[in-house]
A protein has these predicted regions:
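Helix-turn-helix
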Residues: 1-15
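Hydrophobic alpha-helical connector segments
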Residues: 15, 19, 26-63, 115-119
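Hydrophobic/aromatic-rich alpha-helical bundle segments in the mid-to-C-terminal region
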Residues: 80-85, 102-159
Length: 159
């Protein structure tokens, strides 16, 4: 019955990404969390990313499926090919809908696009490493990258 509604296995997997993976752990979820840095008038981008990493650490199986689909998505015939090709732009556009508290030295959110891209790239790499042996702690590993991507002293009061 489910396949009749969805069509095929690839469409089911696509729905898992678009309707589940992308639907949770969002900036809105962070804003509603009340955690430090989640002020809707200016959220902390590094704090949001820590929230996202912690959230992703709780859904390892889904994250693993996402990584497999992302790899398969290199094929132009894959149903998620266009999605993964556009993902950096989609993430940028989505994050740009929110107010972020960014250090003046950075020049505001409009100058954050390369940093957002680097964060996505670093997270992809850390998540791949997280799936391998010996085990690492996803969150602790992200914190090491955070210090490099959001250096002191510029980001000290914006974490």
């Amino acid at each position: 019955g489910l396949l009749h509604y969805i069509g095929n296995k690839e469409n089911l997997l696509s729905m898992l990404v678009t309707d589940n993976y992308d639907a949770y752990g969002t900036p809105r979820d962070f804003m509603e969390s009340g955690l430090p840095g989640s002020d809707p008038n200016g959220m902390s981008f590094p704090a949001y990313l820590r929230f996202l990493v912690r959230y992703n650490a709780k859904r390892q199986s889904l994250l693993q499926l996402y990584m497999v689909l992302e790899s398969e998505g290199f094929s132009p015939e894959h149903p998620l090919h266009d999605y993964f090709e556009e993902r950096p732009n989609l993430v940028w556009e989505h994050y740009s809908e929110y107010q972020w508290n960014i250090p003046p030295e950075v020049g505001g959110w409009r100058n954050m696009r390369p940093t957002v891209r680097m964060c996505l790239e670093a997270m992809d790499g850390i998540q791949l490493r997280w799936m391998r042996k010996p085990p690492i702690d996803l969150y602790d590993e992200w914190l090491l990258f955070e210090r490099i991507i959001f250096p002191s002293p510029v980001w000290d009061n914006y974490r």
